[in-house]
Amino acid sequence: MPAIVLIGAQWGDEGKGKATDLLGGRVQWVVRYQGGNNAGHTVVLPTGENFALHLIPSGILTPGVTNVIGNGVVVDPGVLLAELKGLEERGVDTERLLISADAHLLMPYHVAIDKVVERYAGSKKIGTTGRGIGPCYQDKIARQGIRVADVLDPALLAEKIEGALELKNQVLVKIYNRKALDPAEVVENLLEQADGFKHRIADARLLLNEALERNETVLLEGSQGTLLDVDHGTYPFVTSSNPTAGGASVGSGIGPTRITTVLGILKAYTTRVGSGPFPTELFDDHGAYLAKTGGEVGVTTGRARRCGWFDAVIARYATRVNGITDYFLTKLDVLSSLETVPICVGYSVDGKRTDEMPMTQSDIARAEPIYEELPGWWEDISGCRTFDELPAKARDYVLRLEDLAGAHVSCIGVGPGRDQTIVRRDVLAAR
């Protein structure tokens, strides 16, 4: 079987956890390929149990699935151990979780620098989660990072941390007037934490490619979304990694020719957390309705999400840059009871219409949405399990989004539960 990539097609928080959970029973491997604990997945089991995952792949909730934290992820050891403990206390078997030896470790100095830099940025801050993700990726690119495998060699680990802190402490003390970190203490704490996860360290790229050779199915799970990609997102208001489909190969060690399906996750409206452009953002009662009805609060940050109407411009853009073959449309039920449902079909930038993503940061910031209004529906659709059971106006809305986005809407979420899903086309079927 081939590998399948699951990605967010907006600014994150689209419902990727539900999609992974839905498919989890039919795949053998679930891999997280980028990001860190700066994003969260919410999974609601048929029993009604609610799980919020920040670092561990959503497949951990499906028995028999092997879960991998890939080389493209940055791992906070404390968060990892706390999340494992929380799952185990609720009866979840975590034995089948592996960590790539080449994933990078998020260190205390990354968190310290992230928080202080964001604080000093004032009105120019980009709205980071303050969890050290950006500084950790900076060290990775600068070839100064600490890899997971380094905990297996305490002498090398101590040498690398001492070298890193020579500079980090200068920055903390002399620029930001903060307390220096003790290298020996940092090493000691990390080695103590490593006792709880070093048995999970593996050559993930080898295991994943061997699994594909055995005809097993690998699901590659991204965090955040396309518009937060450091290269393809609304820079500089982006994350520090590549959530887009290209990042799945790099962050897992699986070659791109192994990937035949790219499943994009689209919310039936649009949200984003933190700063940055958002052309369809609502500041009226409709925005408040979407936020309240959709429960739009960040899983990781607890911050209220900004809400707006569906933006077909960014959906088309996501289809293009990811090569999306199928879409999973989530939270369609939230739109029930609206008299009309606007869809952004293009932008006006300085009086000129464009149906494509503006090329420059300043143009995106000035983009004004051009709307097409569709009639709404009043029926409760949370019990619908086939496309034909949806009200005609809800079906029309889905088909219009499909046409505008440029890829087939294969699954539709009509509620938070795993079973509250309409499947129009099997995304795991052979292509």
Curated annotation (Swiss-Prot):
Residues at which IMP binds: D13, E14, G15, K16, N38, A39, G40, H41, T129, R143, Q224, T239, R303
Signal peptide (from-to): none
Chain sites annotated for binding GTP: 12-18, 40-42, 305, 331-333, 413-415
UniProt cofactor note: Binds 1 Mg(2+) ion per subunit.
An example Gene Ontology biological process: IMP metabolic process
UniProt main location, coarse: cytoplasm
Cofactor: Mg(2+)
Molecular function via GO: adenylosuccinate synthase activity; GTP binding; magnesium ion binding
Top-level taxonomic group: Bacteria
Catalytic activity: IMP + L-aspartate + GTP = N(6)-(1,2-dicarboxyethyl)-AMP + GDP + phosphate + 2 H(+)
Cellular component aspect of the GO annotation: cytoplasm
Annotated compartments: Cytoplasm
InterPro entries (UniProt xref): Adenylosuccin_syn_GTP-bd, Adenylosuccin_syn_Lys_AS, Adenylosuccinate_synth_dom1, Adenylosuccinate_synth_dom2, Adenylosuccinate_synth_dom3, Adenylosuccinate_synthetase, P-loop_NTPase
Catalytic residue list: D13, H41
Keyword terms of this UniProt record: Cytoplasm, GTP-binding, Ligase, Magnesium, Metal-binding, Nucleotide-binding, Purine biosynthesis
EC number(s) reported in the record: 6.3.4.4
Binding residues for Mg(2+): D13, G40
Residues engaged in binding substrate: V299, T300, T301, G302, R303, A304, R305
Catalytic class of the enzyme: ligase
CDD domains attached to this UniProt entry: AdSS (cd03108)
Pathway listed: Purine metabolism; AMP biosynthesis via de novo pathway; AMP from IMP: step 1/2
Family named by the database record: Belongs to the adenylosuccinate synthetase family.
The protein's role, per its UniProt record: Plays an important role in the de novo pathway of purine nucleotide biosynthesis. Catalyzes the first committed step in the biosynthesis of AMP from IMP.
Subunit-structure text: Homodimer.
The protein's name in its UniProt record: Adenylosuccinate synthetase
Classification lineage: Bacteria, Bacillati, Actinomycetota, Actinomycetes, Mycobacteriales
